[in-house]
């Protein structure tokens, strides 16, 4: 095998399978492996083109006659908190997030297992074991971090950390943060914790001087994915490039990035 063939990504197409988001549709994905010294650069490039990462695989939808999955990224430094977002932050004022190495723990898995059992018991990840979870976190050749969200415990006499409430697995890209997967204690559902973690990532991107937070795929009409369209202004990937959607919901112009 030549050096050129090792460095050039090979792309593959999956067989059709039932769509997990829209009824009576099937999905196909195109994917490649993210390995080697240039995995980070390739992940950056592919993310800009609408790919997502899962372990050491980068993939994007390649469905026949369907383009419902739209890659979205929030424009972090222009994002303005709505009244609803401020209420979410207020409900989670007792929570602090800590950036850590991508190392799985049994505490994380307990929350992950409860989250799947409560909210995604029939999904494709429903049967994941603790070893599967460890692979999801550790099998990465790019810059990946874990953010643990805990109740504030700094004032406790025993100096122990507060209870773990949520976790985000996040890639650090050259131009933003990419939320690979996030989950939370389902008993805390009144906190709107998924929204809170996105708001926290927007704040972190600003602090790091990164322009975007990549949320994955927005799917209009899908209860599971439609919420991603609420974080405005954002950019949505169209066949002609990234399109800006302003806070009023109007598409204003096409970006050149």
UniProtKB/Swiss-Prot annotation:
Record carries keyword Cytoplasm: yes
Enzyme Commission number: 2.3.2.29
Similarity field: Belongs to the R-transferase family. Bpt subfamily.
GO terms assigned for molecular function: arginyl-tRNA--protein transferase activity; leucyl-tRNA--protein transferase activity
EC top class, as a word: transferase
Its biological purpose: Functions in the N-end rule pathway of protein degradation where it conjugates Leu from its aminoacyl-tRNA to the N-termini of proteins containing an N-terminal aspartate or glutamate.
Protein name in the entry: Aspartate/glutamate leucyltransferase
UniProt catalytic activity: N-terminal L-glutamyl-[protein] + L-leucyl-tRNA(Leu) = N-terminal L-leucyl-L-glutamyl-[protein] + tRNA(Leu) + H(+); N-terminal L-aspartyl-[protein] + L-leucyl-tRNA(Leu) = N-terminal L-leucyl-L-aspartyl-[protein] + tRNA(Leu) + H(+)
InterPro entries: Acyl_CoA_acyltransferase, Asp_Glu_LeuTrfase, N-end_Aminoacyl_Trfase, N-end_Aminoacyl_Trfase_C, N-end_Aminoacyl_Trfase_N
């Amino acid at each position: 095998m030549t050096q050129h063939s090792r460095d050039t990504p090979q792309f593959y197409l999956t067989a059709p399978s039932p769509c997990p988001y829209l009824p009576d549709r099937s999905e196909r994905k195109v994917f490649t492996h993210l390995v080697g010294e240039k995995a980070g650069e390739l992940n950056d490039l592919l993310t800009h083109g609408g790919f997502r990462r899962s372990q050491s695989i980068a993939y994007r939808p390649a469905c026949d006659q369907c383009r419902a999955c739209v890659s979205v990224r929030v424009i972090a430094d222009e994002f303005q908190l709505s009244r609803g977002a401020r209420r979410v932050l207020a409900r989670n004022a007792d929570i602090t997030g800590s950036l850590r190495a991508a190392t799985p723990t049994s505490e994380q898995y307990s929350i992950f297992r409860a989250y799947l059992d409560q909210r995604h018991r029939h999904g494709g990840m429903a049967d994941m074991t603790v070893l599967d979870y460890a692979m999801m976190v550790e099998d990465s050749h790019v810059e990946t971090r874990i953010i643990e969200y805990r109740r504030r415990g700094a004032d406790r006499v025993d100096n122990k950390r507060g209870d773990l409430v949520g976790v985000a697995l996040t890639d650090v890209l050259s131009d933003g943060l990419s939320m690979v997967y996030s989950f939370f204690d389902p008993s805390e559902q009144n906190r709107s914790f998924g929204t809170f973690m996105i708001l926290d990532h927007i704040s972190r991107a600003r602090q790091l001087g990164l322009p975007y937070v990549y949320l994955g795929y927005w799917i209009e009409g899908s209860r599971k994915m439609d919420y991603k369209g609420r974080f405005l202004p954002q950019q949505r990937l169209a066949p002609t490039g990234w399109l800006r959607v302003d806070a009023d919901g109007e598409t204003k112009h096409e970006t050149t990035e």
